[in-house]
Amino acid sequence: MEKKKTSSGCLPGKPCFPWVGGKRRLLPVLIQSLPENITEMKTYVEPFVGGGALFFWLRQTYPHIRCVINDSNESLVNVYRVIRDTPEELVGLLAGIQGEYHTLEERTERRDYFMEKRRVFNEEHPDDITRAALFIFFMRTCYNGIYSVNRKGRLSVTFGTGSRARILEEELIRCNHKLLQDVIILDGDYRQTEKYAGEKSFFYFDPPYKPVNEAGTCTSYMPDDFDDDCQIELAGFCKDLGGKGSK
């Protein structure tokens, strides 16, 4: 069955990789919670973009709204920038990685390939396009799609089931390339998005989760945990945005 395309002539945009905590399945609920006057809004800001499920939906549905996305995970943000600026180079690298990976018959061979790519990512300081390709590869082949780094900030994702996962979605990358044009892409502290606050702007926050126990796997999203004090500071930040008229 042919997949339905949007008015822009491409497949509906969505994240190019699995992302723990992503909101694709919750989109109907989030959409119902958008401001009633959304058509009058001029700026949408997502300070913790992650996989960007709501961002991609909104970008296609309300293309007149300026979008600002940010994340403290520079490696993640780099993927968005590469898709926006050099999609064909990214497609070429992913095709090569997928071809190499799928020729490996044994799980141990695929694990060794995964670990070597992780070493390259951590130790050889590859260029931005290569880093983006490796990031997508890791997220499609690592254990449960869980991104993790150690306390030194080195990537520590673990190998998954070893199946021949689909690594390259060429048409999706090209669609997202179109959607990311003119999007302001930031990396760093969420507070830097405050300058986009105003009566015609609205913010969507999906910060890192507090783990349900001390062994929670998602605490390793970044080297520094987003603890209770950070959550309290974020609540104050949201209050300040409301004082400036933002939704």
Predicted features along the sequence, with ranges:
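Localized chelating/binding microdomains
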Residues: 222
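Conserved S-adenosyl-L-methionine
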Residues: 40-101
